[in-house]
Amino acid sequence: MTFITRWLFSTNHKDIGTLYLIFGAWAGMVGTALSLLIRAELGQPGTLLGDDQIYNVIVTAHAFVMIFFMVMPVMIGGFGNWLVPLMIGAPDMAFPRMNNMSFWLLPPSFLLLLASSTVEAGAGTGWTVYPPLAGNLAHAGASVDLAIFSLHLAGVSSILGAINFITTAINMKPPALSQYQTPLFVWSVLITAILLLLSLPVLAAGITMLLTDRNLNTTFFDPAGGGDPVLYQHLFWFFGHPEVYILILPGFGIISHVVTYYAGKKEPFGYMGMVWAMLSIGFLGFIVWAHHMFTVGMDVDTRAYFTSATMIIAIPTGIKVFSWLATLHGGTIKWDPPILWALGFIFLFTIGGLTGIVLANSSLDIALHDTYYVVAHFHYVLSMGAVFAILAGFTHWFPLFTGYTLHPTWAKAHFGVMFTGVNLTFFPQHFLGLAGMPRRYSDYPDAYTLWNTMSSIGSLISMTAVIMLMFIIWEAFSSKRKVLQPELIATNIEWIHGCPPPHHTFEEPAFVQVQE
């Protein structure tokens, strides 16, 4: 098989998963670089980079790159492609060629996003792309149009991937295997795919209307022609809120596997509770979107509904957190790097969840909306939730993907540096938000200097951690320490073919005997 047929025309779920992981790692470095530019600008009062426009272009690009080109490709495309077929005993994904197309739509999408920042003054709209700021007056030129096309491509990629994962998870498992006997990671990817399939078309509609408002003189979001900018907010957030659950649900699946494995358990605590908690989170995620819009002026009964509906999500989330703790309980914990990431995830994700409960209160949110309190909240659940889950999964399955082992001491040191860096970066932002520092500004009054400087120092520590990770991965490939024998393979069937597994697995259907 030539290099080109293997890597460009690939129909193999393992190779496509590897492509997604490499793409996500590269995009992650771009996104990290953008975040360091943001923290450098905010490291002290005064201007570093230029005006607020360039600053907001960087903020917008940072969000898009991290969401659409780092977290989603790695979690869904990387871990999802690699593990879902192995975990259900399928020979590959249901639609292997469509799988390849899903991946190859992403590099052009990324290219369009980068192009948007090189024409005119860039798209400095924030990742929400609200009109009228995103309209053709405030953002004349092609920048926002290129960003919209980028989103269209990433969206098509995700929708195709979602169809593929739904079909695979439901239809490609052995007939004797009920859906309630599939591993939790398979469930998490299935639910994530359903969320993508239902939410992305709404985003596509919203940004297409924005495109025609900008270029074809329609007035969907322009009051002068009978439109309403708040309609855009509803369309965007009907996608945007499920999106944040799309980013974290595969992480829930990864953490369930890692916690179970390193606690030495053969199954997670409360499997059915875990499944129904994820289903509940997926359902509730669609009916709370307007909590992002408490400041646009809604009726008191509407605010009351969105406040209480948002708080209800804490219940299934709590079920998951306590089930992870119950899984750990009574286990002989194996203190390998992945469990450190998983424990860090549980602790920090819970803190992020608590600040989320605070923000769910519409009255409090009116004071805190668009302050650094919100930034701190979602970075605790993303920068320490999603990213820690990715690193837990990566350090756990790296031997499966490559056949080599990471250096255990360095991997633990990397956890320590990263843990310090992200907490020092984002914890002070709660204080800034409570003190009223607004988001999306490149400068601030001197009173906010101390916590901003602390936050920026934290970002440099996180950068050190990223460089450490690059070295640790290089060291593993360089030293070529082979995997001897994974433990607990009876209850973790992704490992049964050895490390790494052969190019084709389960070519003939697996024999499944169901325990009565």
UniProtKB/Swiss-Prot annotation:
It is a multi-pass membrane protein. Pathway: Energy metabolism; oxidative phosphorylation. PANTHER family: CYTOCHROME C OXIDASE SUBUNIT 1. Its EC number is 7.1.1.9. Its main location: mitochondrion. Na(+) binds at E41, G46, S442. Component of the cytochrome c oxidase, the last enzyme in the mitochondrial electron transport chain which drives oxidative phosphorylation. The respiratory chain contains 3 multisubunit complexes succinate dehydrogenase (complex II, CII), ubiquinol-cytochrome c oxidoreductase (cytochrome b-c1 complex, complex III, CIII) and cytochrome c oxidase (complex IV, CIV), that cooperate to transfer electrons derived from NADH and succinate to molecular oxygen, creating an electrochemical gradient over the inner membrane that drives transmembrane transport and the ATP synthase. Keywords: Calcium, Copper, Electron transport, Heme, Iron, Magnesium, Membrane, Metal-binding, Mitochondrion, Mitochondrion inner membrane, Respiratory chain, Sodium, Translocase, Transmembrane, Transmembrane helix, Transport. It is found in: Mitochondrion inner membrane. It comes from Struthio camelus. One of its GO terms (cellular component) is mitochondrial inner membrane. Its cofactor is heme; Cu cation. Component of the cytochrome c oxidase (complex IV, CIV), a multisubunit enzyme composed of 14 subunits. The complex is composed of a catalytic core of 3 subunits MT-CO1, MT-CO2 and MT-CO3, encoded in the mitochondrial DNA, and 11 supernumerary subunits COX4I, COX5A, COX5B, COX6A, COX6B, COX6C, COX7A, COX7B, COX7C, COX8 and NDUFA4, which are encoded in the nuclear genome. There is a cross-link at H241-Y245 (1'-histidyl-3'-tyrosine (His-Tyr)). The gene is MT-CO1. This is Cytochrome c oxidase subunit 1. Binds 2 heme A groups non-covalently per subunit.
